[in-house]
Amino acid sequence: WREIHTQLHAQVIEMGLRLSDKPAPYEQIHRALLAGLLGNIGCRDLEGDTYQGAREIKFVVSSGSGLRKQKYKWVIAAELQETNRVYARTAAKIEPEWIESAAEHLVKRHYFDPHWEKSTAQVSAYERVTLYGLTVTLKRRIHFGAVDPTQSREIFIRQALVAQEYETRATF
């Protein structure tokens, strides 16, 4: 990270921009780095120290890293080095929400199991978000009407109105 900091500092001075007096918090720094290192993210497998990375890459955090023992679920690496294994060097903990916001234009969204949700009185579905084949969000409940209004309407008619699952005070 020091080398990246040095390069950025030199560019800021060269551009004539003024430096902030306040140090940036951890989240801001790593969100900024994430935008340029999306191919170097990984999610830890449930068993062992292996991380599943983007584009089907598997790696481990290098033995010299302080993160090696921490076993965070999501990490980003400044460098992936391949020897007999692929090692993540200069790694840091990240949150999956950061990935989604940094890669909004690159993530793929898959919607499944649209259904009538009586408790919220809306047609809901589940969303799976992936980036380069890596699942960022597995099963998030969403309002399906914004995704597919036509199918949402059909589900509403079949599962809410015909099945008399829709509760309203309106007179029909």
Regions found by a protein language model. Name each.
Residues W1-F172:
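Extended, charged helical/alpha-beta scaffold domains that provide interaction surfaces
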